[in-house]
Amino acid sequence: GRWQPWHEGHRWLIDQRLNEGLNVCIAIRDVEKSDSNPFSPAEIKKNLERELHDLIALKKVKVIILPDIESINYGRGVGYDIIEHFPPEKVKKISATEIRKKIFKK
């Protein structure tokens, strides 16, 4: 993901997996900075590690940076399951675009 910026919706989704007793690997796409990506992957990783330091120390969460590769893949259903979560209304309403606007108005 882009994680631009980290917000309560991200935390909610991660908590869903942790509550199922599963560990979480957060993959940050290595994208160039832009208006919609105002933070570098290194800045995002540092922020996530600060926000999740307790879970990282317990080895429940790992944060990595991956190359930004876009491709079309066939046979996507092979080897993994798609699990859908339905966030509560307060989480569903979160807009990273609006959060970025507020951050950069300061």
Where in this protein do the model-derived segments appear?
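Nucleotidyltransferase catalytic core that binds NTPs
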Residues: 1-106
